[in-house]
Structures are given as C-alpha cells and as structure tokens.
Amino acid sequence: DFGENKVQEARSKWLEIKKKNPYINLHMIGKLQSNKAKDAVQLFDYIHSLDNLKLANNLARFEKIFNKKLKYFIQVNIENEKKKNGIGIDLLDDFYYYCVRQLKINVIGLMAIPPNNGKEGIYFKKLMELNKLLGLKELSMGMSSDFKKALNYETTFVRIGSSIFGNRD
C-alpha cells in the first residue's frame, strides 16, 4: 500500500505502475477537492479525506460511471480547529448515514489529524470511540510524530512518509 497527497502527483507516478501491478493499493491521504473526484476514483483504492457532501456526491457519481468501489475514511475535525479540514463531530452521524444509506459508498472508518499539543492520546481515544459507535473497523490516525501513540488506540492505518522519505520541500 502507498499513499499520495496530491491527485496530480499520483497520476504522474502511478497510472502506468497500477496498470502493470493492479494488486497495489493506492491511498489518497491529502485534501481532496470535489473537482478532482473523477481522477481520484480512477487512480485510488482508498480515500482518507472524505469530509463534505459535494465531494461525497461526486465520488459516488464517478464510482457508478467507472464501475469501481473505493474504500473511504471520513475525515473528522476532532477538535473543531478552524485551519483543519474534516467534518465536525456534531455532523458526523448524519454525514456517515447519508454516505452509506443514500450514496451507498463504502465507508470503512474514520480519519483524524489531532492537534500537536502533547494530548494526542485524548483525541485518538475519542476517534476510536466514535469509530466503534458507528460500527466501523478501520482507523486512519497517527503520523510520523505520533503514530506510536495512535497504535495504542486501535489505528489500522498510519501515515509515516516523512519518517521514511523526509519532509517535503
């Protein structure tokens, strides 16, 4: 499994590789704009940043067009930070049920990037509990700086690219 932050970069790197190696799972881990939904459905197997109705509707539409089912994580803004993406906890239930019941998209878990304030465990625990309340099995949380803490809270996907490849320019 591999992750990419940007659709354009993924297209330039992975289009040919995935044709020759269809068993590779490609994860969209960055912010996904709704106008990139068509390309995202064609390229990716997982989307970790589902966070609004327009995006969900576009992704569902292109899944039907391309006859492809992706796996989704709803991105939760766990602390309602103004500068972070994600759906608020107060809207999570309605958004989740709309996605699975109306759009019939395969939401497999929640994703969050908590504040980097030394209290990440509190947020990881909260996300784990929300995930369980919705009956979901997968959790996408933990990055290079805090993935060890996230592992204590049943995370199944971590993003550790900067630990492996270094920081982006």
What are these regions (language model features)?
Residues 151, 164-169:
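Expand to "…catalyze enediolate/carbanion chemistry for C-C bond making/breaking, isomerization
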